[in-house]
Amino acid sequence: MQTIIDFIREIDKLKSVERKTKPLGLQRFENSAEHSWQLAVMVLSLSRFSAVPIDVLRTVKMLVLHDIGEIDTGDTIVYATEIREQRKEEELLAVQRICGLLPAELRDEFLGLWTEFESAETAEAKFAHAMDRSIPIILNLANNGQSWRENGIRYEQVIGRNGPAVASGCPALWAYLKEKLDEAQGAGWFV
């Protein structure tokens, strides 16, 4: 029991990992714990639009665990492609450390879910990636492009980096977002 409690206390640190997008109506940045919670709710709400049927519980588990490595590494904006490989290695070490607090059975399950998400090969992982890539778009569309403007993000970057992942896991959501992104481009929300 104590090792599980130690893990639960460790993941509380996700609440202090600041992301680049602001929650609607607030002037502060969201944190990774809020992000993971919102993704779990998105799966519950949007799973019927998945490209193929998915195991909803498995997908939710994946998303509540997918960013725990950020406790050690911090969050990096998805458009920071030049450091992506280095970040993957650092995050793997962090996830291994954090999951290493758990009993072997849970450690292996959680590491497996994290690895499945990172590989993005299963239907659940593809849908999870679609949710993960779409929520910053949804928030930016509601915030007049707040983090796009603050971070010098171009329309082409948003389409190129997010479109394939969202379309692969949730084509209907990508069709909706693409239309809204085109409107945002017309409104001048990108650099």
Give short role names for the model-derived ranges.
Residues 1-191:
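Alpha-helical, largely C-terminal catalytic domains
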